[in-house]
């Protein structure tokens, strides 16, 4: 008992040192426990991947080849370590022949895609910027019709991974997020995604999977990091200071758009059986003696563009890739025009909400479904676009929807969640 009293007396007399020791031990224990949980997640994922690698293949079959485009600079330079610890072991254990190509500077992924050889699957390891560069480089190729059929996997290693929410289960644990995304590539289930082709008058086209933003909310989002010292109030502060500098922040443009296009019926997954020999001979003789009449070529109908002048707080052009499983009658993209009648207080509130999901339209926004759009901007002071969270100089552009252009690997669990949310 005397020893216990002596211990408590020592702790009381040296309470500052005792408090510091408790904080250090608590942090160290939490860090060790987190590392242990991450190791358990990696081990379970590797065991699941090993089951794929142990499957027997025929003597004439060859290993699947995967080309990985890795951006080591993603996630503030941590992407290479995250990939080597959490994704690379899973791919190797699954028996996939992996070729890793690392980028050295911004924009290199576009050039690498021009030189890439045919592969069984393409894996993009990085964030929104890496994904947008690879997709743009892929669809700029002369043989993009062939390469666009290659299934694509996305391993979220960046600071911003917006598309990952549509493909993988959302998790706050970085290790679990990466391992589940890598395993979904091995399982082979895919979903089709729409692509936006954005083309200026002189520039080469840029391609996007999420959308295009132009307006006040986008401009403020680029300055939020300057108010880091305000902690959780930095987003509200950035919008408040912006409203003090200029209000209202109206953006004026001329908008033309085409109506949505009806979605064609899906092709059957199963290839129909080949008819028997006698039936094929009969059809050939019938076509020989009574050849089918050739229909005259139909002249394409002129495009019916609708035009209007817009005055808006922010204009966004979005794909429907947020829920790629949802069945739609028309192939279309969504044009959203935020009302210019917002008060400064509403601007701050809506801007705070948009910092969580930048592509979410605000209440009372005018929404237009279209298959193509032309945006005519003023020659001076147009500002900048955000295309898939990447900054581009704003100019007059034409945006066209390429429906179901690419196929991405998707986890079965996330697909079920999206199907239930319809």
Swiss-Prot record:
Places the protein is found: Mitochondrion inner membrane; Mitochondrion intermembrane space
GO cellular component: a single term: membrane
PROSITE patterns documented for this protein: DAGK
SMART domains to which the protein is assigned, alphabetical: DAGKc
Pathway terms, separated by semicolons: Lipid metabolism; glycerolipid metabolism
Enzyme class: transferase
Gene3D superfamilies with a match to the protein in the record: Probable inorganic polyphosphate/atp-NAD kinase, domain 1
Enzymatic reactions: a monoacylglycerol + ATP = a monoacyl-sn-glycero-3-phosphate + ADP + H(+); a 1,2-diacyl-sn-glycerol + ATP = a 1,2-diacyl-sn-glycero-3-phosphate + ADP + H(+); an N-acylsphing-4-enine + ATP = an N-acylsphing-4-enine 1-phosphate + ADP + H(+); 1-(9Z-octadecenoyl)-sn-glycerol + ATP = 1-(9Z-octadecenoyl)-sn-glycero-3-phosphate + ADP + H(+)
UniProt entry tagged with the keyword Cytoplasm: no
Xref: InterPro entries: AGK_C (IPR045579), ATP-NAD_kinase_N (IPR017438), Diacylglycerol_kinase_cat_dom (IPR001206), Lipid_Phosphate_FormReg (IPR050187), NAD/diacylglycerol_kinase_sf (IPR016064)
Names of required cofactors: Mg(2+)
Alphabetic keyword roster: ATP-binding, Kinase, Lipid metabolism, Membrane, Mitochondrion, Mitochondrion inner membrane, Nucleotide-binding, Transferase
Domain DAGKc: 61-202
Region (Hydrophobic): 18-34
Chain's role: Lipid kinase that can phosphorylate both monoacylglycerol and diacylglycerol to form lysophosphatidic acid (LPA) and phosphatidic acid (PA), respectively. Phosphorylates ceramide but not sphingosine. Phosphorylates 1,2-dioleoylglycerol more rapidly than 2,3-dioleoylglycerol. Independently of its lipid kinase activity, acts as a component of the TIM22 complex. The TIM22 complex mediates the import and insertion of multi-pass transmembrane proteins into the mitochondrial inner membrane by forming a twin-pore translocase that uses the membrane potential as the external driving force.
Family note: Belongs to the AGK family.
Protein name per the record: Acylglycerol kinase, mitochondrial
Organism: Danio rerio
Gene designation per UniProt: agk
């Amino acid at each position: 008992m005397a020893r216990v009293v002596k211990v408590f007396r020592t702790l009381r007399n040296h309470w500052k040192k005792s408090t510091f020791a408790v904080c250090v031990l608590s942090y160290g224990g939490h860090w060790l426990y987190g590392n242990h949980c991450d190791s358990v997640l990696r081990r379970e994922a590797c065991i699941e991947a090993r089951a794929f690698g142990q499957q027997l293949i025929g003597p004439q079959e060859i290993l699947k080849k995967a080309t990985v485009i890795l951006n080591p600079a993603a996630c503030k330079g941590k992407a290479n370590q995250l990939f080597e610890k959490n994704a690379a072991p899973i791919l190797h254990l699954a028996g996939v022949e992996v070729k890793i190509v690392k980028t050295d500077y911004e924009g290199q992924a576009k050039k690498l895609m021009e030189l890439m050889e045919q592969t069984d699957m393409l894996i993009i390891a990085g964030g929104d910027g890496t994904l947008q560069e690879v997709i743009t480089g892929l669809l700029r190729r002369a043989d993009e019709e062939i390469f666009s059929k290659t299934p694509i996997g996305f391993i979220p290693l960046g600071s911003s991974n917006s598309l990952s929410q549509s493909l993988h289960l959302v998790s706050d644990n970085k290790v679990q997020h990466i391992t589940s995304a890598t395993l979904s590539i091995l399982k082979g289930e895919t979903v089709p995604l729409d692509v936006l082709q954005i083309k200026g008058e002189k520039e080469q086209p840029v391609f996007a999977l999420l959308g295009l933003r132009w307006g006040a909310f986008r401009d403020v989002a680029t300055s939020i990091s300057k108010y880091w010292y305000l902690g959780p109030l930095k987003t509200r502060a950035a919008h408040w200071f912006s409203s003090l500098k200029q209000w209202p922040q109206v953006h004026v443009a001329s908008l033309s758009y085409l109506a949505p296009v009806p979605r064609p019926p899906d092709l059957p997954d199963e290839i129909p059986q080949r008819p028997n020999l006698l039936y094929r001979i009969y059809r050939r003789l019938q076509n020989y003696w009574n050849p089918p009449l050739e229909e005259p070529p139909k002249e394409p109908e002129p495009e019916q563009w609708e035009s209007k002048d817009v005055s808006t707080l922010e204009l966004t052009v979005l794909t429907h890739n947020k829920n790629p499983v949802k069945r739609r009658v028309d192939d279309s993209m969504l044009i959203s025009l935020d009302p210019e009648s917002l008060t400064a207080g509403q601007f701050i509130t809506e801007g705070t909400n948009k910092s969580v999901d930048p592509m979410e339209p605000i209440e009372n926004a005018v929404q237009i479904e279209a298959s193509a759009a032309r945006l005519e901007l003023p020659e001076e002071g147009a500002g900048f676009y955000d295309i898939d969270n990447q900054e581009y100089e704003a100019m007059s552009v034409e945006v066209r929807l390429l429906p179901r252009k690419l196929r991405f690997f998707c986890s079965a669990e996330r697909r079920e969640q999206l199907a239930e949310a319809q």
